[in-house]
């Protein structure tokens, strides 16, 4: 009798994706983040579902309902903080996953890569709308500032913003629709993840050397299932340490004040994982220019397959490119720091220089350095 694992129409798909999948023998811990992102998504959907059972999307009661979850619901505080800090973990894994793709040239699988970039956009949109739901001061003003950016679009901008708001300001209609979208988007993300994996399994995984590894494959189970379990345990340890010891470490104290349209907080800033993009947005004095720079700062990832001029796929054997890559990482840390600072000297100029450097490294320096390394191969 043939194994049901290999014959059953449904189990067969799971088998080819997670059990008998041929995987390169040399993929490092940097390849763990895909499974960790899957875990993060599962945690977010489950905790989010239980939060939605007690949350009310009405401006009068939203803030109180979140307080009620934390005080009166059994382990409500745990669910709420796991969801809030789970988002931070999600983005840490996302950034590391994208960084791995850039370093090892995984973007040459361009269908997989482009769906990944779309996933990044959708996750960012979901996180933004989720931040609005507790209806604290930063929720309200963050929503006002970010949605207002769309008014920079010529001709239709103002109409578009009022259409998204459902009125003439961020109000009850906005909160209700944001809740609806925040609920549905994670399921759309899950569907996109399946497409992401579908395209990945067409080509097979990349590996640190960037060389074709067809001649040296090992089964995913047990080798990488056990390796993934280690990553999962470490992620849960990090998440629960954050949730149980300092749940508000990454949050904004202003969000413990109920939303008040008549009082603007001194410093409006998004969650930490959006600060790098926020810094790029603020570094351009023109509104439309800022919005375009903001969108392009993420969209630029789609250009990487076109900007890859090196004869080698991975950066493993390219010291100059490695150097530029880590300067880019340092630049992103700088942008994140600047995004959380007030708009004054010297932060304005540092932000502008860091923004220019970000685009220059990606569009100009990395391709140029790749060409130099190609020449050095013959030297």
Curated annotation (Swiss-Prot):
Record-level Gene Ontology MF annotations: metal ion binding; ubiquinol-cytochrome-c reductase activity
Keyword field contains Electron transport: yes
Entry function: Component of the ubiquinol-cytochrome c reductase complex (complex III or cytochrome b-c1 complex) that is part of the mitochondrial respiratory chain. The b-c1 complex mediates electron transfer from ubiquinol to cytochrome c. Contributes to the generation of a proton gradient across the mitochondrial membrane that is then used for ATP synthesis.
Gene assigned in the entry: MT-CYB
Listed InterPro entries: Cyt_b/b6_C, Cyt_b/b6_C_sf, Cyt_b/b6_N, Cytb/b6-like_sf, Cytochrome_b, Cytochrome_b_C_euk/bac, Cytochrome_b_N_euk/bac, Di-haem_cyt_TM
Co-factor: note: Binds 2 heme b groups non-covalently.
Domain of life: Eukaryota
One Pfam family it belongs to: Cytochrom_B_C
Mitochondrion in keyword set: yes
Organism encoding this protein: Urocitellus richardsonii (Richardson's ground squirrel)
UniProt protein name: Cytochrome b
Residues the record lists as binding heme b b562: 83, 182
Cofactor: heme b
